[in-house]
């Protein structure tokens, strides 16, 4: 009788398209006593944990808790559901509960648990799961081993990932793909390319995902030579310059190639390929707009943005970040306000990354009031958001406003400043000549928050003291600090010498920095400028001859804070 009832219900479950329908079927199961049968219940949980239209993990959990002895299949359904959810930590809780109640995981359980570990970057839990995988003999399973490899790579443990890869019985395209993707995500681009070559020598053909990862690698390390080789490789597989192959147009590969050329600075080829695309996605538009923006061609980036809007394509977060960057390059506050107004209409103004970009844009264009207003509109202000606005204001000449924001951050108490926050604060103090305040903040780092100053923090303090002409304190700090002085430290001292015409200290620094070429051209230039102002032309000549003989090129210098933006 029960079997007679649940077969039609199973059939109806297959056709279920909404949570309302699922609730109705659940009620029918209770009414017809089918609720006691584990088969329809397991299917009900499946629909609550896998189907987008009926996804409801709370509902699935209530059904799960009504089952006296859930099977491993049902445990797996719950773990899978949570591993794919915004709360993957609950998948680990279910896994632990499963073990506690004496159930034995199978080769479906481990991949779901390892996926949760990957999402959480929980290497400690993942290592424990690895141990249990070995204990139960599932390390020989290809699917489980590949998930272990992926987990270690996601957690940044590349060497452990390599060991897992080497122990995989048979290296198929999925295993190679996980290895190459792991290398790329951990910025080991040459290793990714070498792995591809080894894969080819093993007779395994690359799939679309692998080719995309390799193009990403070439773009990130700006290796256009290898990128062009991969472009030719794709053409050898049947793709012409317009990506039309025997199986049709591949928009993903096309976009990846455009992105690679743009990141390598070859905008001409990137645009040629973009114009030749028979169809474009938002990602395609973002690639070309971002390419122009990152390469300093703000006008073309904004033109492409307007073209995209004319075609009725709605921008996303990536689009806005690129356009805001382009507006910042243009240095026009009015243009920035227009973009800000458009961002507000779309609802992206609540996104922390976009608000931080707007703040930096306004700060750079000299509009400190608009920068502060944009920041005020952000509902949730975490440490990163506070830090970005502080550094944005400080690095663009609005030191007092930066310190005012920092004071509010401390008063609110809902975010704790970190080392980068204090770098912005010290930079602000340096540029408005607040010596005592700078010393107080420098001490506060360690005393209140347990933050050990880095060479960048020491550089800011040396700059503060040197600008104020307090050279004895600056020298004492350089001699007693626990880190080796770098170009920023010596540069800060020499900058103070330049301001206050301190030739005695300049000579001492020149003798202390035995090989200034190791620190770059900036030290040479500062020394030369100081001696030129003092009319010591013989010293200027010696320095310039030294630069020429040692082939030191004159380049523009930037502070450690300025290079962050």
UniProtKB/Swiss-Prot annotation:
UniProt repeat feature PPR, residue ranges: 37-70, 71-105, 106-140, 141-171, 172-206, 207-241, 250-280, 281-315, 316-350, 351-381, 382-416, 418-448, 454-484
Record-level GO cellular component terms: mitochondrion
Domain of life: Eukaryota
GO biological process, one term: mitochondrial mRNA modification
Molecular function terms, GO-annotated: RNA binding
PANTHER family the record matches: OS07G0636900 PROTEIN (PTHR47926:SF344), PENTATRICOPEPTIDE REPEAT-CONTAINING PROTEIN (PTHR47926)
NCBIfam families: PPR
Name the record gives this protein: Putative pentatricopeptide repeat-containing protein At3g05240
Organism field: Arabidopsis thaliana (Mouse-ear cress)
Organism ancestry: Eukaryota, Viridiplantae, Streptophyta, Embryophyta, Tracheophyta
Name of encoding gene: PCMP-E82
């Amino acid at each position: 009788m029960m079997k007679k009832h649940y077969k039609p219900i199973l059939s109806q479950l297959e056709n279920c398209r909404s949570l309302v329908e699922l609730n109705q079927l659940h009620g029918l199961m209770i009414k017809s006593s089918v609720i006691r049968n584990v088969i329809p219940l397991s299917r009900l949980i499946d629909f609550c944990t896998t189907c987008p239209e009926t996804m409801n993990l709370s509902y699935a959990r209530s059904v799960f808790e009504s089952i006296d002895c859930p099977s491993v299949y049902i445990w797996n359904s719950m773990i899978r559901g949570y591993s794919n959810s915004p709360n993957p930590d609950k998948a680990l809780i279910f896994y632990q509960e499963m073990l506690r109640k004496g159930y034995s995981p199978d080769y479906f359980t481990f991949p779901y648990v390892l996926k949760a570990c990957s999402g959480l970057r929980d290497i400690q839990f993942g290592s424990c799961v690895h141990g249990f995988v070995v204990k139960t003999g599932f390390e020989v399973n290809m699917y489980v081993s590949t998930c272990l490899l992926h987990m270690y790579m996601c957690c940044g443990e590349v060497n452990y990932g390599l060991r897992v890869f080497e122990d995989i019985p048979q290296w198929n395209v999925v295993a190679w793909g996980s290895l190459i993707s792991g290398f790329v995500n951990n910025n080991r681009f040459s290793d990714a390319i070498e792995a591809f070559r080894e894969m080819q020598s093993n007779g395994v053909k690359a799939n679309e995902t692998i080719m995309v990862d390799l193009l990403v690698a070439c773009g990130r390390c700006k290796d256009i030579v290898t990128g062009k080789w991969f472009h030719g490789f794709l053409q050898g597989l049947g793709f012409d310059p317009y990506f039309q192959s025997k199986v049709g147009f591949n928009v993903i590969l096309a976009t990846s190639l455009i992105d690679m050329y743009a990141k390598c600075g070859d905008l001409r080829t990137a645009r040629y390929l973009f114009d030749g695309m028979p169809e474009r996605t938002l990602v395609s538009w973002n690639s070309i707009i971002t390419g122009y923006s990152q390469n300093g061609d703000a006008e073309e980036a904004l033109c492409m943005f307007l073209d995209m809007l004319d075609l009725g394509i709605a921008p996303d977060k990536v689009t806005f970040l690129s356009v805001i960057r382009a507006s910042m390059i243009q240095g026009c506050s009015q243009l920035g306000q227009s973009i800000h107004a458009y961002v507000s209409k779309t609802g992206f103004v609540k996104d922390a990354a976009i608000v931080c970009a707007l703040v930096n844009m306004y700060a750079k264009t000299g509009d400190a009031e608009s920068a502060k207003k944009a920041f005020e509109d952000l509902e949730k202000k975490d440490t990163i958001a506070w830090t970005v606005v502080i550094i944005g204001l400080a690095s663009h000449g609005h030191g007092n406003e930066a310190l005012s924001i920092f004071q509010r951050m401390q008063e609110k108490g809902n975010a704790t400043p970190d080392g980068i926050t204090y770098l912005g604060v010290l930079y602000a103090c340096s540029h408005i000549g607040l010596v005592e305040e700078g010393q107080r903040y420098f001490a506060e780092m360690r005393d209140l928050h347990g933050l050990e100053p880095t060479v960048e923090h020491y550089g800011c303090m040396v700059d503060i003291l040197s600008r104020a002409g307090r050279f004895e304190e600056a020298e004492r700090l350089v001699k007693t600090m626990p880190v080796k002085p770098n170009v920023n430290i010596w540069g800060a001292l020499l900058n103070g010498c330049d301001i206050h015409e301190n030739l005695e200290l300049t000579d001492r620094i020149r003798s202390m920095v035995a090989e200034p070429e190791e620190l770059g051209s900036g030290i040479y230039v500062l020394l030369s400028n100081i001696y030129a102002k003092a009319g010591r032309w013989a010293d200027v000549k010696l320095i310039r001859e030294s630069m020429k003989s040692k082939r030191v090129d004159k380049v523009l210098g930037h502070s450690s804070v300025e290079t962050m933006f």
